Amino acid sequence: MSPWTPQVFTPCPDHPDVLLGRVAARSAAFEGTSAAGGARVIVGSAAGHEREQVARSARGELLERVGNVMAGRAAEAAAETVATHGELRRRGLAALAPPGLPDSRRLWVRGRTVAGAETYVAAGAVFLQHRPPPGCDTLPSTGSTGIAAHPDAASAARHAAWEVLERDLVRRSWYGLTDRAPRMLDAGPAGPLGALIEDRGLTASAFALPAPPGAECVVVALHRPDGTGQTFGARCGPPGDVAALVEKAAYEALMVRWSMHTVTARGAWEEWRGETPPTTAVQHALWAYYRQDSLSLWDVARTQARDRADPVDRTGQPDRADPVDRTDRTAPAGRAGPPRSNRPADPLAVLAGHTGQDVILVETSTKSVRSAGVRVVRVIAPGALPLPSGHVPGPGRSRPHPFG
């Protein structure tokens, strides 16, 4: 078994066709993460009902993150271009203006627009767990949204573009920044996952977010019939096969649900108890699961969900050990309709049209990752923002978002 071989297992033995895959790498080059209880570990995970696909997806997620971090360490050691944004512009170099503190000294790396123009990008916007070289200001680094690994760079870029668009559409909808409400879908996952959801007495609430032409973005929440215990997943892709997007989003929500019963999540909840706004991915997921009726806040709660005047569940009591819950009654999920269209969509073009700005690509493939047969690409789309952490003051919905 190679270091990149995931463990594929069944979270519910009575539903052996529903699979989770996980694989981890440890290194002093990594920073501690909340998902690993502070350990210097990077994890790749996936869910599905085809063993080879689950293993491939979990391995790909690990490789994209490891490749990105290690490419960052190489760039940090070389420290080839350290400057302020203004200094780069005075040298006649195209550079993406960083948000906030434009006069800060940073490490910069080369990227290219989709059209091929060279553009410098701040390393903190490219690399996970960025460690600024000496002489640079210490600033927050970016998250994993917008990194993908595939056998070829073009496929990796397309995958990452869908991911960037997905998170921006979720952000805009959750914080009330769109002029349209989410559209409820009479659709739920079928097949092995649908059977598991029905057997566990859970409800799958699926809805579509406002999306630009050429894209469809769906969110799925798994929860008990009374609306408690919510976990979320989302997926963005080309229009025409909503059923596939719903299934992928539902599997993501299932992974989050399973993770709520891990030692790391239980320990985090016992220590934190939701007494302050969430600041990490794990805390956001715990907040949605134990404390917040996010479906009601999003104005998309199904009639099966309990109508509560107070949108916060203050009990905060962990469930039984069943990794995806079991209740006394069932709530069959709906079934997705037929595909609407098979028209191909270029996610890079859709993303550029959505933001009105050039999309920038930075390859972060290391030698070890290339030897594993993949290329890693970071997609940066000015104007498309990731989900923030914690409370966001201002107009619209200010409660913490429910995505871990």
Describe the residue ranges of each PLM region.
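Helix-biased "structured C-terminal domain" signature
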Residues: 1-316, 328-404
